[in-house]
Amino acid sequence: MKKAGIIHLGCSKNQVDTEILMGFLKELGYTFTPYLGEADLVLVNTCAFIKPAWQEAEENINFLKEYKENNKNLKIVVTGCYVERFEKELEDRYPFVDLFIGPGEYDKFVSLITSNGERKIHSSPASSFMYTHKMPRVLISPNFWVYVKISEGCNNFCSYCTIPFIRGRLRSRSIDDIIKEVEILVQKGVKEINLIAQDTTRYGEDLYGKSALVDLLKSIENIKGDFYVRILYSYPSRVTKDLINFIKVSEKVVPYFDIPIQHVNDEILKKMNRSYKKDDIIRVWSTIRENFEDAVIRTTVMVGFPGETEENFEELIAFIKAYPFDRLGAFTYYNEEGTISKNFDGQIDEDEKIRRYDILMSTQKEISKKLNAKLLGREFDVIIENEKGKYFIGRSWREAPEVDGVIMIPKEGSRSISIGDRVRVKIKKYRAYDLLGELV
């Protein structure tokens, strides 16, 4: 039986792609092995959003050169955003790679894998591929939580971002197709559905002439089963009162708001081509806090954007102190080829970017400690994900997979529980990002 090794890189959206491509390989008769040396085919699904991502892609591709030298029959296939972004340079850089397939060509994946065509590189900037519930999928996440990608591409065109040029314009799946996928997943025992897209709040604009996110959520609400839904990647100015009001009464959609604000200074936001101002962020933050006693608000911010002054940075720090976020991720600005901001004046020194990043994360660490301290004594339903040393590791609805902290439960003194179980946990201790609890 043919064996395939998989190297997955990048974000949650790319993870869905990896799982679909693995589904295609499984249908072709491949089984999967963690040992690349025994593989007949190795698939590397890459990211290329920012410099660290495409550098990681390059390292992983080059890592396979030795495997190819030791096994001339090994088929190396590189997919993902790196292929789309660096298409013209691939053949010269990686002569040992057999096939490059960009995200827009995944509908041809099976035929390309099984053919012996002379053309090695297949990419399509005007991407039209979108997976459906009918496509095979092999989950690489635990089988009790999953990402569901509701749209592909992006129409926002932020000045620092390459995604619209790599993934194309917004393309939404139909509500009916998404509902069928969720029904299948729930029937298989999935307890946590994470809806993702480049911008979930623009879902449906291309199909229905307006955002259809609330309509989608209403349809998901009618699906029977023991599961909950978390929405990720929401655009600040598109978190509407209708969306908030629906989540407030929903029995399925949890009040977890992932809203990347990027910055709070109006001039910086304008240069980023973000279509909102600081007051809009305050309005959304305040509306959520007013409507939910227990909402989680997560955000992502960027430091070191061209022209960001010390005063602009201090404004950002002051903001997160005044309007604290339960979770905050951050990254430094990367001056990427092909972006509008590449040619902006006021490019900031790398050491200064890192200094600002460190200050920001140190500030958020203290904020997180204070917020976590308020959770002492509270009880939550927790899904057990894995074990680590003396602890069971799990998450409640308050912790998104991979990006947030976890809840740790000591094994000693706990009754017998298994991976995938949902248990009631009382919070006894806290850290900056993780919580420690005991079974109730």
Swiss-Prot record:
Its cofactor is [4Fe-4S] cluster. Residues 2-118 form the MTTase N-terminal domain. Residues 373-440 form the TRAM domain. It is found in: Cytoplasm. Its EC number is 2.8.4.4. GO terms for cellular component: cytosol. Transmembrane segments: none annotated. Binds 2 [4Fe-4S] clusters. One cluster is coordinated with 3 cysteines and an exchangeable S-adenosyl-L-methionine. [4Fe-4S] cluster 2 binds at residues 154, 158, 161. It is an enzyme of class 2 (transferase). GO terms for molecular function: 4 iron, 4 sulfur cluster binding; aspartic acid methylthiotransferase activity; metal ion binding; protein methylthiotransferase activity. Gene3D superfamilies: Methylthiotransferase, N-terminal domain, Nucleic acid-binding proteins, tm_1862 like domain. SMART domains: Elp3. [4Fe-4S] cluster 1 binds at residues 11, 47, 81. It catalyses: L-aspartate(89)-[ribosomal protein uS12]-hydrogen + (sulfur carrier)-SH + AH2 + 2 S-adenosyl-L-methionine = 3-methylsulfanyl-L-aspartate(89)-[ribosomal protein uS12]-hydrogen + (sulfur carrier)-H + 5'-deoxyadenosine + L-methionine + A + S-adenosyl-L-homocysteine + 2 H(+). It comes from the Bacteria. GO terms for biological process: tRNA modification. Pfam families: Radical_SAM (PF04055), TRAM_2 (PF18693), UPF0004 (PF00919). Residues 140-370 form the Radical SAM core domain. Keywords: 4Fe-4S, Cytoplasm, Iron, Iron-sulfur, Metal-binding, S-adenosyl-L-methionine, Transferase. The keyword Cytoplasm applies. Belongs to the methylthiotransferase family. RimO subfamily. Catalyzes the methylthiolation of an aspartic acid residue of ribosomal protein uS12. This is Ribosomal protein uS12 methylthiotransferase RimO. It comes from Dictyoglomus thermophilum (strain ATCC 35947 / DSM 3960 / H-6-12). The gene is rimO.
